[in-house]
Amino acid sequence: MTKYIFITGGVVSSLGKGITAASLGRLLKGRGLKVALQKFDPYINVDPGTMSPYQHGEVYVTEDGAETDLDVGHYERFIDENLSHYANCTTGRIYQTVLDKERRGDYLGQTVQVIPHITNEIKDRVTMIEKENSPDIVISEIGGTVGDIESLPFLEAIRQLKFDLGKDRVLYIHVTLIPYIEAAGELKTKPTQHSVKELRSIGIQPDILVCRTQKELSEDLKAKLALFCDVDREAVVQLPDAESIYEVPLMLAREKLDLEIIRRLGLECKQADLKEWKELASRVHRLDKEICIGLVGKYVELPDAYLSIVESLKHAGFQYNCEIKIKWIYAEKVEKEGAEELLQNVDGILIPGGFGERGIEGKIATAAYARENRVPFLGICLGMQCAIIEFARNVCQMKGANSSEFDPDSPYPVVHLMPGQENVANKGASMRLGGYPCRLVEGTLAYGVYGVSETSERHRHRYEINNEYRKEMESKGLVISGISPDGQLIEIIELKEHPWFVACQFHPEFKSRPNRPHPLFMGLIKGALDYKEEPDTASREG
């Protein structure tokens, strides 16, 4: 029968519950167990799809088209499996479902309340994965911090699940902070004691404490935490700050967290196989080269807005023993100061996805700089659309070419709304979302790095390249190297006579894994390494 692990957080937010959950998933999978992960977010939005990146960070898209929390990206990357829409659920989704049931009369005249109706719906969401995929372990992360009003229904639901499922099938892990007081030179346990007290007042006694800390915990301190938080000494696990998130599974393994879970849940499993992960973690410290990638975006002051892109660049860098330095560049700053001023010292350029007109001309100027100076370039989603606009304006001499998103009256709408998107009223979950097949054209750069004739990639967009201008742009040197099976949607473009100028309509960052970097990121990093090794600036400018 499926066993359940619930991860809560205490003292402060942003402790790394998601990384802890993902790392635990990796450890248990390494022992031959089938693992599923999910995240519950206590906000009232139905999903993060319409939220500002400044509020939420990136929106991570699953293979089946769900717009989810960025922690789902960590889950997929660490356990190296595709998750589904079951991996993320919000308060808004729960309430929407309950209200829909009430309107249909499913509750047969009952007064609909937080308990039992909301909590029952949460419990159904937790156990739904068991019915769909029959995993050995479901790891559920509860967003927010213990003590938040918003999290109370979720905490009550997971409290009830121990009663419903049985004590031998449920385990609670509390991730907490042990702050170091510089003036006193001491680590303090009192915040954790109060956090556990708050959790116990709700009816949940944590089985294991994962203690985030800047300093090593002494045996005396661990014993104190065990005594006052009423957990076994072996269940006090320290998790110091790590140089790389990919070290965290090994740090938890050294603390024997997986063994403690196996013992408590009575799991039967094989010896841990972490050979591949150990090699990955050691590679992080053997990087003997360095390149700089200029990332030109709208939300660069919040790197979490581009989290999967950052991790994908790192994955490719690991394969080439290369450290990736990212130069974060405001697209609007490019408009004011010029592309050459800001990009002259980078080894490669990436324009990520985004929405809205702000900074667009800066991104278009960036694409022009990469094309004219033969700088390795990767455009993603809106990044590809900007590259197309630039090519149409400056190579095809289509004066005023633009996307109908930014200029509905453009004489050359080289990017336009996809069919069926014209009169969409509700913005949530209405884009082209999730995995779609893409056919690759032999003899192209894209085909060379993929090494296959067809692949599947994840999308999140409303606009597409306008096929009306396709032939004219191809006649001027645009290469269409990836296309939908019906031949209608341009998925990947590149340029003739350029060593690496590739752009795609989809989001390759959602398919990259630390042990299997995405081919397009591999191509960008290889191109950047070659570019950096060119003998002089003149040759770079071609």
Curated annotation (Swiss-Prot):
State the active site.
C381, H507, E509
Binding partners and assembly: Homotetramer.
Reactions that this protein is recorded to catalyse: UTP + L-glutamine + ATP + H2O = CTP + L-glutamate + ADP + phosphate + 2 H(+); L-glutamine + H2O = L-glutamate + NH4(+); UTP + NH4(+) + ATP = CTP + ADP + phosphate + 2 H(+)
Tell me, what controls this protein's activity? Allosterically activated by GTP, when glutamine is the substrate; GTP has no effect on the reaction when ammonia is the substrate. The allosteric effector GTP functions by stabilizing the protein conformation that binds the tetrahedral intermediate(s) formed during glutamine hydrolysis. Inhibited by the product CTP, via allosteric rather than competitive inhibition.
Q: CDD domains per the record?
A: CTPS_N (cd03113), GATase1_CTP_Synthase (cd01746)
GO terms for cellular component: cytosol
What InterPro entries does its record include?
Class_I_gatase-like (IPR029062), CTP_synthase (IPR004468), CTP_synthase_N (IPR017456), GATASE (IPR017926), GATase1_CTP_Synthase (IPR033828), P-loop_NTPase (IPR027417)
Keywords recorded for this protein, A-Z:
ATP-binding, Glutamine amidotransferase, Ligase, Magnesium, Metal-binding, Nucleotide-binding, Pyrimidine biosynthesis
Region entry Amidoligase domain, spans: 1-267
PROSITE patterns recorded = GATASE_TYPE_1 (PS51273)
Per the similarity annotation, which family is this? Answer: Belongs to the CTP synthase family.
Q: Which organism is it from?
A: Syntrophomonas wolfei subsp. wolfei (strain DSM 2245B / Goettingen)
Q: Which residues cross the membrane?
A: none
Query: What EC number(s) are associated with this protein in UniProt?
Result: 6.3.4.2
Name-wise, this protein is CTP synthase
Under Pfam families, the record lists: CTP_synth_N, GATase
First-tier enzyme category under EC: ligase
